[in-house]
């Protein structure tokens, strides 16, 4: 990964101070029902419900309360948790209602569910909200898990099973988002362990370490899964398009954008499952070591905070902590509003962009230059 960093001139604060200042401004954004204004899917420009933004801010508000002990952040975090536990966004009592895009599921695959599970698990532990932890585990276990393939299925908001989510970063983020529940649930711990056991066989790389977009279990395993349950026929489609996408320049561009997303998820899993043998696997090491963060800076796919995502990977996998601050600063340069201390963007909804500061919750305190 590169050592890209902005100029060193300007104010230096700690990441904890940055989180608190950002959370202070977020209090003005929070609505009466505890939710935060929804953004738009920044890859496909599709309308979203408040689930994603509220989940991110729930993480930040609860963490800032844990850091500062200030009651106003506790109250705001509790209100956000209450919203995530409400019937409006789980209208049928199954999965979260995340988007309303023509021709697509409302659950937004596994990734749509990963964010509220992550938020409820994190905030539930800090706020001592067992109801939050219980719903997070409930939503996790609603998703069927194939022990042989090591993959989860999507479940629509009405409970309909939609077969496997074939997008690898969705599988990784669902496991990562649920990983904080592992200490609370043997079911969660066992399924994520199996997912990690199978990950090398489901993940394919380009020769330079770039992770390919789709999960790719072996053809034999895919055929067996379809025989067991015919609804899994899309797995066979993966195999049909695999070689075409391997040569597609547009697909490679997309995969570059999602590299920090994948590595962020792997970092979150490493922090919760540090002793698992997958971390010494050659595919994982190659993906971590072979890619340059600068390649992601002008890509309109994947992560909108690639520097912070790579910083989390550096923290989880590298002994060199000196690169963490410069990577964070890469995202702050040009994005941080120095009045509100919210992240902004010219190309992405500010509601989405500002909420992604929650990535810093998972890092220890660091001094960062925020410019002037």
Regions from the PLM with identified roles:
Residues 1-372:
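Glycan-recognition and catalytic cores of secretory/periplasmic carbohydrate-active enzymes
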């Amino acid at each position: 990964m590169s050592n890209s960093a902005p100029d060193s001139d300007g104010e230096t604060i700690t990441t904890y101070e940055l989180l608190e200042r950002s959370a202070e401004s977020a209090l003005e954004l929070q609505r009466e029902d505890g939710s935060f204004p929804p953004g738009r899917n920044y890859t496909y420009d599709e309308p979203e419900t408040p689930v994603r933004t509220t989940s991110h801010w729930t993480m930040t508000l609860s963490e800032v309360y844990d850091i500062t002990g200030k009651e106003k952040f506790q109250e705001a975090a509790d209100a956000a948790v209450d919203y995530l536990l409400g019937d409006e966004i789980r209208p049928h009592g199954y999965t979260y209602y995340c988007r309303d895009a023509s021709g697509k599921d409302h659950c937004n695959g596994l990734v749509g569910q990963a964010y509220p599970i992550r938020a409820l698990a994190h905030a539930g532990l800090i706020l001592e909200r067992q109801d939050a932890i219980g719903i997070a585990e409930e939503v996790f276990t609603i998703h069927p898990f194939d022990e042989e393939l090591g993959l989860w299925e999507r479940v629509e908001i009405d409970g309909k099973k939609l077969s496997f989510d074939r997008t690898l970063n969705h599988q990784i983020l669902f496991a990562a988002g649920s990983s904080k529940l592992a200490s609370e649930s043997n079911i969660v711990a066992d399924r994520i362990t199996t997912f990690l056991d199978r990950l090398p066989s489901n993940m394919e790389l380009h020769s330079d370490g770039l992770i390919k977009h789709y999960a790719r279990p072996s053809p034999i395993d895919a055929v067996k899964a379809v025989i067991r349950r015919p609804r899994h026929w899309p797995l066979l489609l993966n195999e049909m398009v695999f070689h075409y996408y391997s040569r597609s320049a547009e697909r490679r561009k997309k995969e570059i954008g999602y590299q920090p997303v994948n590595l962020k998820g792997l970092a979150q899993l490493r922090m919760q499952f540090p002793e698992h043998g997958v971390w010494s696997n050659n595919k994982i090491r190659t993906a971590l070591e072979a890619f340059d963060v600068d390649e992601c800076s002008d890509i309109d796919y994947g992560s909108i905070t690639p520097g912070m995502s790579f910083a989390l990977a550096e923290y989880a996998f590298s002994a060199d902590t000196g690169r963490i601050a410069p990577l964070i600063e890469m995202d702050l340069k040009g994005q941080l509003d120095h009045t509100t201390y919210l992240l902004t963007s010219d190309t992405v909804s500010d509601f989405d962009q500002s909420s992604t500061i929650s990535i810093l919750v998972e890092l220890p305190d660091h001094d960062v230059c925020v410019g002037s």
